[in-house]
Amino acid sequence: MSGNTLGTLFCVTNFGESHGPAIGCVVDGCPPGLPLEAADIQAELDRRRPGTSRHVTQRQEADQVEILSGVYEGVTTGTPIGLLIRNTDARSKDYSNIADTFRPGHADFAYWRKYGVRDPRGGGRSSARLTAPTVAAGAIAKKWLAGQFGVRVRGYMSQLGPIAIPFSSWDDVPGNAFYAPNAAVVPELEAYMDQLRRDGDSVGARIEVVAEGLPAGWGEPIYDRLDADIAHAMMGLNAVKGVSLGAGFESIAQRGSEHGDEITPEGFASNHAGGVLGGISTGQPITVSLAIKPTSSIRVERRSVNRAGEPVMVQTLGRHDPCVGIRATPIAEALLALVLIDHALRQRAQCGG
C-alpha cells in the first residue's frame, strides 16, 4: 500500500493497523542535535489518547511511545527515528458482525474494492488509531520549530455539531475535553454529547489550527505551495471533509477591497489570506479551519450490502468516538507542524535561510 509517507525533506512514514500488535512511524530527515526524549513526545500523545473522558472512545490505550533509533545520549543523530506505540486494548470480537458487510460512511467498501481484502478489526488501516504516530512525529517537529524559530502551533474547537463556540481565551483550551476556547460553553457541549451517546449517534465538528512566529518566505510556487501542502496533509486526517485557510469560503462574499490584506509600514492590517500568499508564507499567523464529518461507526441501524451484494442492516458495536473532532485538535496541530518543518528545511536548503 503506497501513500503512507508525508514530507519531502522531513519525511514521516506511518505503519500499523488498529488491532495489530503495534503502530508507529519512521521519521527521516530530522536535523541532528535536537534534544529529544520520550517525555517530549508523550506529552503530545497524552493530549490525543483515548479513554480520557466520557465523550470519547472508552478504549484504554496508554499510548506509551518507544524511541527505537535515531537518538543517542538525549539528542537526535540525524538518522531515521523509529517510534513505536503498542496496542494493548483491542477487542476484535466487537467487529465479527461486520466482517462481511460495509458500514455506511466508512472506508470498508472503498478498501475492499481497491485491494480485494480488508481488515475489519477496528477499521484496520483506515482507523483513527493511526493518528497516534502522526502526533508522535509532530511532537518532534513542534520542538524543532520552537527552538529554531520560536514557532508556536496550537488549535481549538470552534464548533461541535450545531453549537458554535465563540473564542474567549487560549487559556480555556487545555481545561476541558473539547479543546474549547470558551469555558462558559462547555456545559452545553457536555449535555449535547451525553444525549448523542444515548441516541447511539455521532456528530461533526470544526477545528481551528494556528501557527505563529514563522518568518516570511517558507513555501514554493505552483505545485508545492505551502497552503497546498497544508491542505494535502490535513485531508489525510480521518474524517476531514473540508480545509480552508484564512477567510476561506467566506472569501466568496467579500469584495477585493475587503479581502486583500493591506500592508502598512507596521505590517499587514488584516489576515484574510491566512498567512500565505502565492504559496509562500507572509510572516502572518497561518490559520487553518477543518470540517470534520460525523463518526461513521454508530449504533443506529443503517442500510448497506454485504460482499455478495445482498441488502443488510448494519449496526456498529464496540467502542467509538461519538465525535472524532473532540480528539482532532492535537492531530491537526501535528500535521501543520510537520508541513512547516518540511518547508523550513526546504527553504534552508534552497535559500540558506
Curated annotation (Swiss-Prot):
Molecular function, one GO term: FMN binding
Binding positions for NADP(+) per the UniProt entry: 48, 54
Cofactor note: Reduced FMN (FMNH(2)).
The EC number(s) this enzyme carries: 4.2.3.5
GO BP terms in the entry: amino acid biosynthetic process; aromatic amino acid family biosynthetic process; chorismate biosynthetic process
Pathway: Metabolic intermediate biosynthesis; chorismate biosynthesis; chorismate from D-erythrose 4-phosphate and phosphoenolpyruvate: step 7/7
Binding site for FMN: 125-127, 238-239, 278, 293-297, 319
Gene3D superfamilies on file: Chorismate synthase AroC
Cross-referenced CDD domains: Chorismate_synthase
Domain of life: Bacteria
One GO term describing the cellular component: cytosol
Cofactor(s) essential for the protein: FMNH2
Keyword Metal-binding in annotation: no
Catalysed reaction, written as an equation: 5-O-(1-carboxyvinyl)-3-phosphoshikimate = chorismate + phosphate
Keywords: Amino-acid biosynthesis, Aromatic amino acid biosynthesis, FAD, Flavoprotein, FMN, Lyase, NADP
Subunit and interaction comment: Homotetramer.
Similarity comment text for this entry: Belongs to the chorismate synthase family.
Function: This reaction introduces a second double bond into the aromatic ring system.
Protein name per its UniProtKB record: Chorismate synthase
Organism: Bordetella bronchiseptica (strain ATCC BAA-588 / NCTC 13252 / RB50)
